[in-house]
């Protein structure tokens, strides 16, 4: 347990350093927005990058890899800023929803059911412009976007992926994965 480890750190070092461990309870200096922090923070940072070029998320096609906390809360904040997230992924593959990822459905599948993204495509149906691509049959970075936000695992973009993103017209990449 993180609280125990934090207590032992304090005992051994005789110092109170709230930033030494993540995931602590509020009593030990933890965050109220623990689940959201990385996704929100990366989205704010990426928005600031876009703004230095006179751009914003508004109306942009965005691809977010992953579907854990970082990705889900990246999707949430991008949508709040007016971007349209058209794809996200999990270890089984990626889903493309041309009308924009349905955040409520994504949260239901990943946070409540603990299901796979293939369920998203099954629920939405291919007639609605939603499709699922299994792992190994393509890369989420093949999906055309203006902003790419790797949020699944660190160092996931390869040179090949970067070249594909450039070919597809990406203007910004904001990596939230850690």
Each language-model region and where it sits:
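N-terminal ligand-binding/catalytic initiation module
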Residues: 1-32
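Generic structural hydrophobic/aromatic packing signal, biased to beta-strands
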Residues: 2-5, 62, 88, 106, ...
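Charged/polar, solvent-exposed surface patches and flexible loops
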Residues: 4-7, 108-111, 164
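A glycine- and small-aliphatic-rich helix-loop capping segment at beta-alpha/alpha-beta transitions
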Residues: 7-12, 79-84, 169
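General beta-strand structural signal in soluble alpha/beta enzymes
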Residues: 15-21, 64, 87-90, 134, ...
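Short amphipathic alpha-helical segments, especially helix-boundary/capping motifs
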Residues: 16-24, 49, 159-165
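Glycine-rich phosphate/diphosphate-binding loop of Rossmann-like nucleotide-binding domains
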Residues: 24-25, 30-36, 40-141
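ADP-ribose/adenylate-binding Rossmann-like module
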Residues: 146-178
């Amino acid at each position: 347990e993180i609280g125990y480890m934090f207590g032992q750190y304090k005992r051994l070092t005789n110092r109170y350093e709230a930033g030494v461990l993540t995931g602590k309870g509020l009593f030990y200096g933890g965050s109220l927005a623990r689940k959201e922090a990385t996704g929100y923070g990366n989205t704010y940072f990426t928005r600031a990058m876009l703004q230095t070029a006179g751009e914003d998320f508004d109306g942009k096609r965005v691809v977010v890899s992953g579907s854990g906390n970082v990705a889900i809360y990246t999707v949430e904040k991008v949508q709040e800023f007016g971007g349209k997230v058209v794809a996200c992924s999990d270890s089984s593959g990626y889903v493309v929803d041309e009308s924009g990822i349905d955040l409520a459905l994504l949260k239901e599948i990943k946070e409540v059911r603990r299901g796979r993204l293939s369920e998203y495509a099954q629920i939405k149906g291919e007639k609605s412009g939603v499709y699922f691509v299994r792992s190994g049959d393509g890369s989420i970075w093949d999906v055309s976007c203006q902003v790419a936000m790797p949020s699944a695992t660190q160092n996931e973009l390869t040179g090949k992926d970067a070249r594909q993103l450039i070919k597809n017209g990406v203007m910004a990449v904001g990596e939230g994965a850690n």
